[in-house]
């Protein structure tokens, strides 16, 4: 009997030690990418970390800025980035050209061209003499990087009008925040003006919209949150916690009653006056699904366009590269 009690005590002690080890496990480190301030969730998510109930417990979160989504691909391949906000184009490039066939779409970030919502604008100078797309022949076009979503949209629109890069126009790369200055200083003749830079007062005064992205691509699943399957499988519980916190914070930002505070946060991030952000999280903004559910049908069309423009060669069935179970499980917790 005494031996049995000792054995039971040993089993209990081992159980307590195991539980203690589990409870003391280090939180999973999540590095999350962004390109455009305010437009990308990672640039503002930590401003409302008080709503992230699991942050610091099951996971930690760091945000990292990149010039464009193509630059994230190397970081993903080197395991330097756990959650990336890839565009439809860079997703296709990552899958085929970089061999990242375990990358998975896990959530929506924003969509372009949804009826009634904002679509990215492409500006020329008012004094440029450029009145139609065909007038861009022989001109210099600004881009934030070959193969980015914006880059593909430009190429698609110019292709529709019979213009091809190198043969008919030249591309010049630069960061998105610098685009208005590049146009007004006559370094380029056309720029992509994404939010929030399209509301630059000087750009609006001296430039004009030549076309919108919806004219080139229709409805676009512009940016998605992605992660590698190997990372999801290894850290599923932490990823569901992260996604739950994301949903909670996104709901806060999208609630109209929080608009003024959201504008103050945007002002802090961009160093621009808060009154410039009246459009933020309204129909003057790009569409953001409140449940973070991506539009996979639109994404398939967008990936097909990327292939048609020569960035990838093979047909990609995008549903094979989506894992929406994280967002679905997280959403159930909030009901």
Task: For the regions a language model picked out, list residue spans one by one.
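Conserved C-terminal helix/tail region of periplasmic/extracytoplasmic solute-binding proteins
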Residues: 303-335
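Bacterial N-terminal signal peptides
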Residues: 7-18
């Amino acid at each position: 009997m005494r031996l049995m009690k000792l054995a039971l005590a040993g089993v209990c002690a081992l159980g307590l030690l195991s539980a203690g080890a589990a409870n003391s496990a280090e939180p999973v480190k999540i590095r999350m990418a962004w390109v455009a301030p305010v437009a990308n969730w990672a640039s503002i998510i930590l401003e409302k970390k008080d709503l992230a109930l699991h942050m610091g417990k099951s996971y930690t979160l760091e945000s990292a800025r990149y010039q464009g989504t193509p630059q994230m691909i190397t970081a993903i391949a080197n395991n330097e980035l756990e959650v990336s906000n890839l565009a439809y184009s860079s997703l296709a490039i990552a899958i085929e050209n970089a061999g990242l066939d375990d990358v998975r779409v896990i959530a929506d970030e924003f969509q372009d061209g949804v009826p009634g919502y904002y679509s990215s604008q492409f500006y020329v100078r008012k004094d440029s003499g450029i009145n139609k797309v065909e007038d861009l022949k022989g001109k210099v076009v600004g881009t934030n990087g070959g193969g980015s979503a914006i880059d593909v949209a430009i190429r698609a629109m110019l292709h529709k009008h019979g213009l091809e890069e190198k043969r008919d126009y030249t591309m010049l790369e630069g960061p998105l925040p610098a685009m208005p200055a590049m146009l007004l200083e006559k370094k380029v003749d056309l720029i992509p003006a994404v939010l929030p830079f399209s509301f630059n007062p000087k750009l609006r005064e001296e430039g004009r919209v030549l076309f919108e992205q919806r004219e080139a691509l229709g409805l676009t699943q512009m940016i998605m949150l992605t992660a590698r399957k190997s990372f999801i499988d290894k850290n599923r519980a932490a990823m569901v916690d992260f996604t739950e916190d994301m949903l909670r914070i996104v709901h806060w930002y999208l609630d109209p009653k929080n608009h003024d505070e959201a504008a103050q946060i945007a002002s802090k991030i961009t160093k621009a006056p808060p009154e410039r952000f009246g459009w933020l999280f309204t129909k003057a903004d790009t569409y953001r699904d409140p449940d973070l559910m991506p539009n996979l049908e639109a994404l398939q069309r967008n990936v097909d366009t990327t292939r048609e423009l020569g960035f990838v060669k093979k047909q990609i069935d995008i549903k094979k590269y989506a894992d929406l179970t994280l967002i679905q499980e997280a959403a159930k917790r909030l009901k």
